[in-house]
From Swiss-Prot:
MF terms in GO: glycine binding; glycine dehydrogenase (decarboxylating) activity; pyridoxal phosphate binding
Claim: GTP-binding is one of the keywords in the record: no
Entries under Gene3D superfamilies matching the protein: 6.20.440.10, Aspartate Aminotransferase, domain 1 (3.90.1150.10), Type I PLP-dependent aspartate aminotransferase-like (Major domain) (3.40.640.10)
Subunit structure: The glycine cleavage system is composed of four proteins: P, T, L and H. In this organism, the P 'protein' is a heterodimer of two subunits.
The protein's name: Probable glycine dehydrogenase (decarboxylating) subunit 2
Substrates-to-products reaction catalysed: N(6)-[(R)-lipoyl]-L-lysyl-[glycine-cleavage complex H protein] + glycine + H(+) = N(6)-[(R)-S(8)-aminomethyldihydrolipoyl]-L-lysyl-[glycine-cleavage complex H protein] + CO2
Taxonomy, superkingdom: Bacteria
Function as written in the Swiss-Prot or TrEMBL entry: The glycine cleavage system catalyzes the degradation of glycine. The P protein binds the alpha-amino group of glycine through its pyridoxal phosphate cofactor; CO(2) is released and the remaining methylamine moiety is then transferred to the lipoamide cofactor of the H protein.
Cofactors that this protein relies on: pyridoxal 5'-phosphate
Gene Ontology cellular component terms for the protein in this record: cytosol; glycine cleavage complex
Length: 492
């Protein structure tokens, strides 16, 4: 296969007068748009769309697809992202015409099947999480975080405790946690980790006070370590009048083993695009449902989908609702994929998913422990963080090793996160990878570790085989080329 190092943009392929498809002869009056729309909405100049033949168009997108990388292309151990295989049966279900061609503004009587899917998925997620009610509206994980925090805020205000304006986040937390807290109008307060990578209970007691609104936790946490003192954490925060929020990014490690609701969490968000096999990695669409305990149910976004006398309907009568958080009812196509996955796997299957995810992560950790610094040596859950500090002694950083992995057809793990691990590399293999794939990855990681000692330039100059070499990251940050006009100016 011939692969070009550089591909012309679709605009650079454009030649005036070329076209790929002939539209039927128009039957609409030329002036119809002007009659229907206010002048301010009408374009004054023609859109600068590329003009290409159909063959050129097909080749352009085929070439781009060959350069893309996804979980169907190769191993994708991106820590905290759960890049598991997306079963193709999901796509078949999502393309059933009755689902794919429905419209959110259709009458409830015409979309009973779609509403049944929404309601059934709500019920499944309630069972999986141990929550009493679930809304599917939020469009992504961070959106779910914000939604839950707005529910917490409304709850505290209704109870006459609007002064609670602090949200506690661990120093190993996802960056979205403090960002969501700030966006919801709270102050983020950091709690330290102890030497085992868990929440430091003494430090938690220090930061909890009368202004504590909530604590945001992932369990297992971002280091892949289960917070074994979770019940103590629950008691400390609840006794201070605060609430517990569960970031569902790492639910893949504990399905059908333990539920957030049973650990004392008051609200949870899930990532259907991670744990429940919605395709992601290209920017979406995602889905971040939020589940809550009964004390918070009256604050959920409206509408909710309910079942009355075997009929499914939207319920807008939610007393203390924070209001709608997403147009229509969220990203329905992802609901279909998640529901298909849950029903395909069943309870036993989901339990086996978590067991395999944990086994795979610990297998990699065991194979790499003699070649890399492992800051937290105990057994992990679904992911773990290693440190490139040994390799840094030879002038090779984690970024360089990540670039070198590209030469072996592996997507690099998450790097420099969480922030409390020097030269961190967070590895999450998921349950869907074979032992052969895990061994290939480990072999290449060990090879890179040896190169860092014996031939560091080979790592420092990587990648060697990719279409794009290393970017000038400083220039990309300060002088980004974001539009075709920028590129044209650069070339001139």
């Amino acid at each position: 296969m011939v692969v070009s190092k550089s591909s012309p943009l679709i605009f650079e392929r454009s030649k005036k007068g070329r076209y790929a498809y002939s539209l039927p002869k128009k039957e609409i009056d030329n002036g119809a748009v002007e009659k229907l729309l206010d002048d301010k909405f009408i374009r004054k100049n023609k859109a600068e769309l590329p003009e290409v033949a159909e063959l050129d168009l097909v080749r352009h997108y085929t070439e781009l697809s060959n350069k893309n990388f996804g979980v169907d292309s190769g191993f994708y151990p991106l820590g905290s992202c759960t890049m598991k295989y997306n079963p193709k049966i999901n796509e078949k279900i999502a393309r059933i015409p009755g689902f794919a061609e429905s419209h959110p503004l259709q009458d409830e009587s015409q979309v009973q099947g779609s509403l049944e899917i929404i309601h059934s998925l709500q019920e499944e997620l309630k069972e999986i999480t141990g929550m009493d009610e679930v809304t599917l509206q939020p469009a992504a994980g961070a959106h779910g975080e914000w939604t839950a925090l707005m529910i917490f805020k409304a709850f505290h205000q209704k109870n006459g405790e609007g002064h609670r304006d602090e949200v506690i986040v661990p120093d190993s937390a996802h960056g979205t946690n403090p960002a969501s807290a700030a966006f919801a109008g709270f102050k983020a307060v950091t709690v330290k980790s102890n030497e085992r990578g868990e929440v430091d209970i003494d430090d938690l007691k220090r930061v909890v006070n009368e202004n504590t609104a909530a604590i945001m936790l992932t369990n297992p946490n971002t280091l892949g370590i289960f917070e074994k003192n979770i019940m103590d954490i629950r008691n400390i925060v609840h006794e201070a009048g605060g609430l517990l929020y569960y970031d569902g990014a790492n639910l893949n490690a504990i399905m059908d083993k333990v539920r957030p609701g049973d650990m004392g969490f008051d609200a949870v968000h899930l990532n259907l695009h991670k744990t429940f096999t919605g395709p992601h990695g290209g920017g979406g669409p995602g889905s971040g449902p939020v589940g809550v305990k009964k004390e918070l149910a009256s604050f959920l976004p409206k509408p909710m989908v309910v079942k009355e006398d075997d009929v499914y309907k939207y319920d807008n009568d939610i007393e203390n609702s924070i209001g709608r958080v997403k147009p229509f009812y969220g990203n329905f196509g992802i609901y279909l994929r998640a529901y298909t996955y849950i029903r395909t796997m069943g309870n036993k299957g989901l339990e086996e998913v978590s067991e395999a995810a944990v086994l795979n992560a610990n297998y990699i950790k065991a194979r790499l422990k003699d070649h890399f610094e492992i800051p937290y040596p105990q057994y992990c859950k679904h992911e773990f963080v290693l440190s490139g500090s040994k390799q840094k002694e030879h002038g090779v950083r984690t970024l360089d090793m990540a670039k070198r992995l590209l030469d072996f057809g592996v997507h690099p793990p998450t790097i420099y996160f969480p922030l409390n691990v020097e030269e961190g590399m967070m590895i999450e293999p998921t349950e869907t990878e074979s032992k052969e794939t895990l061994d290939y990855f480990c072999d290449k990681m060990i090879e890179i570790a040896n190169e860092a000692k014996e031939d560091p330039d080979k790592v420092l100059e990587a990648p060697h085989t990719t279409i794009i070499d290393r970017l000038d990251e400083t220039k990309a940050a300060r002088q980004p080329v974001l539009k075709f006009e920028n590129l044209r100016s650069e070339k001139e």
